[in-house]
Amino acid sequence: MQTSSEPAASETAALLGKPLADRVMRGVRADLKAWAQLDPPFEPQLVSVLASDDEASQVYVQSKAKRAKKLGVAFRVVDLGAAATQEALEQTLRELSADPAVHGIVLELPLAAGLDADAALLHIAARKDIEGLSPANLALIAAGREPEALLPPTPRSVRFLLRHALGDDLRGLRVAVIGPGRTVGRPLLFMLNNKGATVTLCNEHTRDLAAVLAAQDAVVVAVGKAGLLRPEQVQPEHVVIDAGINVQESGDMVGDALPELPVRAQTPVPGGVGPLTSALMYQNLVRGVKLQRGEPVDD
């Protein structure tokens, strides 16, 4: 079951992703070690597909490569460049999906201008879609059938952290999600609803945001706009989960919320959502591989 391995809840003012990621990775390493000891040894392969010059995507790819090397997962990048055509992108995804040597595929978003991500995601095999963004996986989530899906790692990371801060039972809690994007906001809306939370969906243009947020127990921000969430918009009892990533000219990475907001708890950027997201992606890889190999998979 996708949620059975989620860490137990505990209140904390410093919502760091690494301690939770370490718990997830212990299980991932155990499976990878067992495969490495087979005769012949089995090593899963993860492929990251780029079709843009987006700086944040480059950061994510570098992070994935480092983690894969440490784990013993084969990793390669297919960089089609910002000038890639829709046809070339879709053909690449079809070929990777059909390749038995490839076990996980990540399409790095956003794509270059003119490319259709929704159309491209249709060409990733559901069991290789370790980012959980294909229509097949998202439809299962929206239908409340999470155990059958590969859940998107970033929104799942957000939900982990909310449960860690507010308790395992999210029923009745009020959560504002700022940013209705494909990778975080949209799937998170359904994933929180599946756990009984009451979700208010906002965007960067929401009027009188402070008034909208006042009644919430938690605020999730995932727009991709540095400094979007400010002190005057939050309440002392809020838990703030910052899923934004913005690379400044200096090369520093910052979130969508200003740091050290006057709230009950907040995730830092970097160090909050990111480490846990990476761990959950590899957990999805392991689960997807088991489905592909016909091995038993926990519901």
Curated annotation (Swiss-Prot):
Pathway(s) per entry: One-carbon metabolism; tetrahydrofolate interconversion
Sequence positions that bind NADP(+): G179, P180, G181, I245
InterPro entries the UniProt entry points to: Aminoacid_DH-like_N_sf, NAD(P)-bd_dom_sf, THF_DH/CycHdrlase, THF_DH/CycHdrlase_cat_dom, THF_DH/CycHdrlase_NAD-bd_dom
GO biological process, one term: purine nucleotide biosynthetic process
Catalytic activity entry: (6R)-5,10-methylene-5,6,7,8-tetrahydrofolate + NADP(+) = (6R)-5,10-methenyltetrahydrofolate + NADPH; (6R)-5,10-methenyltetrahydrofolate + H2O = (6R)-10-formyltetrahydrofolate + H(+)
Keywords: Amino-acid biosynthesis, Histidine biosynthesis, Hydrolase, Methionine biosynthesis, Multifunctional enzyme, NADP, One-carbon metabolism, Oxidoreductase, Purine biosynthesis
EC number: 1.5.1.5, 3.5.4.9
UniProt xrefs under Pfam families: THF_DHG_CYH, THF_DHG_CYH_C
Molecular function GO labels: methenyltetrahydrofolate cyclohydrolase activity; methylenetetrahydrofolate dehydrogenase (NADP+) activity
Record-level GO cellular component terms: cytosol
Family: Belongs to the tetrahydrofolate dehydrogenase/cyclohydrolase family.
Function: Catalyzes the oxidation of 5,10-methylenetetrahydrofolate to 5,10-methenyltetrahydrofolate and then the hydrolysis of 5,10-methenyltetrahydrofolate to 10-formyltetrahydrofolate.
Xref: PANTHER family: C-1-TETRAHYDROFOLATE SYNTHASE, CYTOPLASMIC (PTHR48099:SF5), C-1-TETRAHYDROFOLATE SYNTHASE, CYTOPLASMIC-RELATED (PTHR48099)
Subunit comment: Homodimer.
Protein name: Bifunctional protein FolD
Gene name linked to the record: folD
